[in-house]
Design a protein with these regions (language model features):
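Formylglycine-dependent sulfatase
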Residues: 1-411, 416-417, 426-463
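Residues forming the ATP-binding cleft of Hanks-type serine/threonine protein kinase domains
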Residues: 423
């Protein structure tokens, strides 16, 4: 009913456009986030004119659940809502209105290119135009046909197929232009749309979802060539006292040519491939920003760029996402708003904050009793401000609360707990939840977790 009532409130021409850019599996591995060994000149340039959130976190360390959470502004709720990659917001929370539908009902023209919702059919009717992908079937069809839809381009890749999944190699370096791979097509479509939407006469919400640096690590050769060597993680071992619920992701094993995390040559190739893909996305992002400037639209367009969750690159002996370690949950988030501040924010923020922030910046009311996040507008006006003390993450029955010092998690079924003190152990190498000195912290954060969950699950949104 809220969306129907909102139809009467058309957005006026003073409302700013929104360019909403997501990159799959992108952790804060950029120069602007202090990583010296990676080449991200375009992200770094953008960061200088934006607010960079240094303590931004996803709410679920897997694409399907994270994206459903971002686009509805709602926390995951195990075991009924946003629990894994298979989830759909339209099924798990059928009464919730996605940001696309909310903006459409308020007079925005909304467009989805590439990977925005994990499943292209999820809330497809909430957009002004049908969501677009170069290959609508997604990454689950025609795996063995390596040249079917620009996933693998080297003929050699077609000789290496995982017989269990029919997927090709976990990485590829093809001597091709940026436009050859799938993300090149996503950029091309977005550039055309940007020009088209400029002349439409109404504000727009243009979502651009890059597939990389998600597996497989396939990027043009010139980006691989940037990394003749990459530094390896120093803590390639399981943290002491880590609960058994925290395990390595098996995602990469669905591809061909895979080894184990203790194989240093394999691990080096994993990190090199990830870095190459990040630099590839950086180059595409730079082209998009250049076109925004060329079209004269930068002064009336909000730009939001972020990753949907983190990724382990050998830390803790893990390769992939799917954990409650900070390497899996911390994400890059940068927001540029014409006329507002630029700088670095140390405030704890989470991806559910994006929805209310967009509503606030666009001058429209938010859906009643739906959103779990807070608007980041106070920080966008003054980066020294803070809007919250902690963030909430959930994964496979594990509840996670992080603040500026601690990473705490608990599993209700087993009673196991996890606590890392970032003042003493920034890399999370020792679980101290069983240390008597930290008992007050465990009790405090456990109580705070219950408060967060009580607020977040105040209303039943599932069928």
């Amino acid at each position: 009913m809220q969306a129907a009532e909102a139809n009467a409130k058309a957005a006026n021409k003073k409302h700013m456009n929104v360019l909403f850019i997501m990159a799959d599996d992108l952790r804060p591995e950029m120069g602007c986030y202090g990583v010296k060994d990676i080449h991200t000149p375009n992200f770094d340039r953008f960061a200088k004119g934006a607010v960079l959130f240094d303590n931004a976190f996803c709410n679920a360390p897997v694409s399907g659940a994270s994206r459903a959470s971002v686009l509805t502004g709602m926390y995951p709720n195990y075991p009924t809502r946003f629990i894994d990659y298979t989830c759909k917001a339209s099924v798990d929370a059928p009464d919730a209105i996605p940001i696309s539908g909310w903006l459409t009902s308020h007079g925005y023209h909304t467009v989805s290119n590439g990977k925005i919702m994990h499943h292209i059919e999820d809330h497809a009717d909430s957009w002004s135009e049908a969501p677009w992908r170069w290959h609508p079937d997604g990454y689950d069809v025609y795996w063995a046909e390596y040249n079917r839809w620009e996933l693998w381009l080297n003929s050699e890749s077609g000789k290496h197929i995982n017989p269990r999944t029919m997927r090709g190699p976990f990485c590829e370096s093809a001597d091709v232009p940026d436009s050859a791979y799938d993300d090149g097509h996503v950029l091309a479509k977005t550039l055309v749309d940007l020009c088209r939407l400029r002349d439409m006469g109404k504000p727009f919400f243009l979502a651009c979802g890059f597939w990389k640096p998600h597996l497989p690590f396939c990027a043009p050769k010139k980006y691989w060539d940037m990394y003749p060597s990459v530094p390896m993680a120093a803590n390639q071992y399981r943290p002491t006292g880590l609960p058994p619920e925290v395990q390595n992701s098996g995602e990469i094993n669905a591809y061909a040519c895979v080894s184990t995390p203790d194989d240093q040559e394999f691990l080096r190739l994993v990190k090199t491939g990830y870095y190459a893909c990040v630099s590839y996305v950086d180059a595409l992002f730079g082209q998009l920003m250049d076109e925004l400037d060329r079209l004269g639209m930068a002064d009336n367009t909000i730009v939001i760029v972020f990753g949907d969750h983190g990724w382990n690159l050998g830390e803790h002996g893990f390769v992939g996402k799917h954990t409650l370690m900070t390497t899996s949950t911390r994400v890059p988030l940068m927001i540029r708003v014409p006329g507002m501040a630029k700088g670095v924010s140390k405030s704890m923020v989470e991806l559910v904050d994006i929805y209310p922030t967009i509503c606030d910046l666009c001058g429209i009311d938010a859906p009643v009793q739906q959103l779990d996040g807070k608007s980041l507008t106070p920080i966008l006006r003054n980066p020294s401000r803070s809007v919250k003390r902690e963030v909430y993450v959930q994964w496979q029955g594990g509840d996670n609360l992080q603040d500026n010092r601690f990473n705490y998690a608990e599993w209700q079924k087993s009673g196991n707990t996890m606590l890392f003190d970032h003042n003493a152990d920034r890399d999370e190498n020792a679980n101290v939840s069983g240390n008597a000195d930290y008992a007050p912290t465990v009790n405090r954060m456990s109580k705070e977790m219950k408060k967060v969950k009580k607020f977040a699950f105040r209303k039943k949104w599932t069928k």
